[in-house]
Amino acid sequence: MKKVKLSLIANERSRKTSFIKRKDGIFKKLHELSTLCGVQACALIYSPFIPVPESWPSREGAKKVASRFLEMPPTARTKKMMDQETYLMERITKAKEQLKNLAAENRELQVRRFMFDCVEGKMSQYHYDAKDLQDLQSCINLYLDQLNGRIESIKENGESLLSSVSPFPTRIGVDEIGDESFSDSPIHATTGVVDTLNATNPHVLTGDMTPFLDADATAVTASSRFFDHIPYENMNMSQNLHEPFQHLVPTNVCDFFQNQNMNQVQYQAPNNLFNQIQREFYNINLNLNLNLNSNQYLNQQQSFMNPMVEQHMNHVGGRESIPFVDGNCYNYHQLPSNQLPAVDHASTSYMPSTTGVYDPYINNNL
């Protein structure tokens, strides 16, 4: 909802419209208040737009409520009474209190930043006076009091300070570890330190592991002791991809997890995969007329088609198959081409020939 600016409406017509609208709203709210809560209320409104002041609920009802109000003692009457000046003074007092609280919060943040910068050696960047130093001292004393109170509470509860706080990491040199895994590794540590293992959980380090390591040329090619045996151990990397798959017996934990969900089914790959694909694809045109008539396609040469047919068709003794695009999803096989009777390709052509019945007509009109 748009916030209304509380100022006098300059336009007289708009001011009158707003007056009528809001007056009816006040009377409606008073009716709801007196009906729902069972209280006595009245309203008197004077306006330059109406000659006679308006009262609610009526003139008699307004007089009755006003007389009861005047019978009350002056202290009780002025306790909740407020005019415009009193209302504005109360708002100003609340605003000043909020401003004071915000100023104190900003000062606390400034002094805290000043303290941290002094710890970092940036005290020379500030222009401070005696009051700033006093505020800094108060801030430091506040933090010290909190730390001392925490220490005293721990001592009173019978707890040890070292047991409640995680121990500091103890750093030792790499040469003092004495593990065979580091001595056999192709990566040799020269200088640096590593963190010790946690006493409660030996698999977790208590701090950062920041060794300075240098590696020679053998560190790149030589296999380490833990990771390099997983993808390549006991696997024939030079096996023929067209041969049947050979499943290896797992020799370690990693090979077992790789092969435990595999079915031991061998698949015989075709000897010539591309030849089979070509035969399946180019058998679509077996029933077409390859010996096209020169009168149909004058630019078509028989010598150009023969090499393509010989290249993409299988040998004579091979098995011909009906392609999948003809609706043969089961790949039924035909008889070998050497057992099929010799059929003239011209008889299987779906194109009408220009020679034959229409020869006299063509010869007479050309």
UniProtKB/Swiss-Prot annotation:
Which residues does the UniProt record annotate as the domain MADS-box?
1-59
Q: Which domain of life is it from?
A: Eukaryota
Cell wall biogenesis/degradation: present as a keyword of the record?
Answer: no
Entry coiled-coil feature ranges? 86-115
Primary subcellular site in the record, as a coarse category: nucleus
The alphabetical list of record keywords is:
Coiled coil, DNA-binding, Nucleus, Transcription, Transcription regulation
The record's GO CC annotations read: nucleus
Where does the UniProt annotation locate this protein? Nucleus
Q: Name one GO molecular function term.
A: cis-regulatory region sequence-specific DNA binding
Q: Which SMART domains match?
A: MADS
One GO biological-process annotation of the entry reads: positive regulation of transcription by RNA polymerase II
Instruction: Please give the function described in this protein's UniProt entry.
Output: Probable transcription factor.
The subunit field of the Swiss-Prot or TrEMBL record says: Interacts with AGL62.
What PANTHER family does the entry give? AGAMOUS-LIKE-34-RELATED, MADS BOX PROTEIN
Could you tell me what this protein is called? Agamous-like MADS-box protein AGL36
Identify the gene encoding this protein.
AGL36
